[in-house]
């Protein structure tokens, strides 16, 4: 697996298969999530940006960090399940009210082996 990008040592792909590998065991659903809330400083900056239009960089950065954390937690959960890969990886988001949002990463934790050519 040295030629593939991994997260916490786990191959993570959005596809049902990994080229050059075969699934030999399904371990279950791997998942990881995080809830993020804004703070008054970000809210003020966002309000000012909203007045003139355009991207709200403070929120974009916060959500990017949240996605990376959810992805890392999902990979760690897959490792706990005994997997070395996650296939069919997806993100989900939900608004928890006010200025809080949940980012959830999930996929199928599997054990894969390299296919000999």
UniProtKB/Swiss-Prot annotation:
Bilayer-spanning residue ranges: none
InterPro entries per UniProt: UPF0145_dom_sf, UPF0145_YbjQ-like
Domain of life: Archaea
Pfam families named in the record: YbjQ_1 (PF01906)
Assigned protein family: Belongs to the UPF0145 family.
Name this protein carries in UniProt: UPF0145 protein PH1682
């Amino acid at each position: 697996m040295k030629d593939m990008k991994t997260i916490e040592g786990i191959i993570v792909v959005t596809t049902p298969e990994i080229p050059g590998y075969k699934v030999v065991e399904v371990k279950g659903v791997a998942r990881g999530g995080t809830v993020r809330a804004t703070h008054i400083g970000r809210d003020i900056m966002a309000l000012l940006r909203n007045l003139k239009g355009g991207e709200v960089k403070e929120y974009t950065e916060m959500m990017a960090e949240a996605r990376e954390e959810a992805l890392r937690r999902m990979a760690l959960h897959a490792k706990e399940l005994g997997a070395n890969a996650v296939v069919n990886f997806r993100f989900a988001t939900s608004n928890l009210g006010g200025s809080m949002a949940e980012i959830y990463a999930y996929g199928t934790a599997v054990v894969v082996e390299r296919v000999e050519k």
